[in-house]
From Swiss-Prot:
Protein family according to the UniProt entry: Belongs to the ABC transporter superfamily. Phosphate importer (TC 3.A.1.7) family.
SMART domains: AAA
One GO molecular-function entry: ATP hydrolysis activity
Organism: Bacillus licheniformis (strain ATCC 14580 / DSM 13 / JCM 2505 / CCUG 7422 / NBRC 12200 / NCIMB 9375 / NCTC 10341 / NRRL NRS-1264 / Gibson 46)
Enzyme class: translocase
EC code: 7.3.2.1
Protein name: Phosphate import ATP-binding protein PstB 2
Predominant place of localization: membrane
Gene transcribed to yield this protein: pstB2
Localization: Cell membrane
């Protein structure tokens, strides 16, 4: 299927005149000395790491360890929390997305997010995909039709819904709703997908479909997933970061994290001694 170009969607790079770092060739994100506070409480402590392009990076750790706060910082969702403040840098292909002159709306198109609980709009399946596109100015039906099919196909949902596109999205199963939410995000043509426990509320069969989908999507997107399911992290991710009490304890290839971790705290968590 031909790629659809949407000139109405300006990119972050088009909006900000900052030269990218040379290091951005192999890494799509570089985090430097990141601290995140809620009021006086520091939730993320001086984290530095690089995220590979076209890979799945898993963030693991016990509840309250800072992994979801860290994930939300990557497309500035924490800006929506009045008490939150951030210091340090998050460089997306060389651009510091924490700069005040970054267009946050455009940033969230390029770095899309899917949440734990499926949240389809109370609209038709078709309208769920096209809603943001129309808001951005795309009105051509032929273009919208193509994006709907392309996005639902990438989310492994097209064959299940192609004959019911104008039915309510709320009529779908939980697993189908979550894949619809992924398709809705893909319709905006992001570079990065942020997934906050996308399968935790689903049954085992739907969970397996989401995992299979994530592995396939990394060919085209860079994916960061928060998960409490360590088996899931070991199955689908290329790199794993272990967070504890706001600190990044260890970050390495997933195989090494699970088979031969360097830190005792990582080993204890992997082996279920706490968490």
């Amino acid at each position: 299927m031909a790629q659809v170009q949407m000139p109405v969607l300006e990119t972050v790079r088009d909006n900000i005149g900052i030269a990218p770092f040379p290091e951005a060739k192999e890494h799509i994100l570089e985090v430097k000395n990141l601290n995140i506070y809620y009021g006086e409480k520091r939730a993320v402590n001086d984290i530095s790491m690089r995220i590979d392009k076209h890979a799945v990076t898993a963030l693991i750790g016990p509840s309250g360890c800072g992994k979801s706060t860290f994930l939300r910082s990557i497309n500035r969702m924490n800006d929506l929390i009045p008490s939150a403040r951030t210091s340090g840098e998050i460089r997306y292909e060389g651009l510091n997305i924490l700069d005040s002159n970054i267009n946050v709306v455009n940033l969230r198109r390029e770095i899309g997010m899917v949440f734990q609980k499926p949240n389809p709009f109370p609209k038709s399946i078709y309208s769920n995909i096209t809603h943001a596109l129309k808001y951005a100015g795309e009105r051509r039906k032929s273009v919208l039709d193509e994006i709907v099919e392309e996005s639902l196909t990438k989310a492994a949902l097209w064959d299940e819904v192609k004959d019911r596109l104008h039915e309510s999205a709320l009529s779908l199963s939980g697993g189908q709703q979550q894949r619809l939410c992924i398709a809705r995000t893909l319709a905006m043509k992001p570079e990065v997908l942020l997934l906050d426990e996308p399968a935790s509320a689903l049954d085992p069969i739907s969970n397996a479909k989401i995992e299979e989908l994530i592995v396939g999507l990394k060919e085209e997107y860079s994916i960061i997933i928060v998960t409490h399911n360590m088996q899931q992290a070991s199955r689908i991710s290329d790199q794993t970061a272990f967070f504890l009490n706001g600190d990044l304890i260890e970050y390495d290839r997933t195989e090494k994290i699970f088979m031969n971790p360097s830190e005792k705290k990582t080993e204890d968590y992997i082996n279920g001694r706490f968490g």
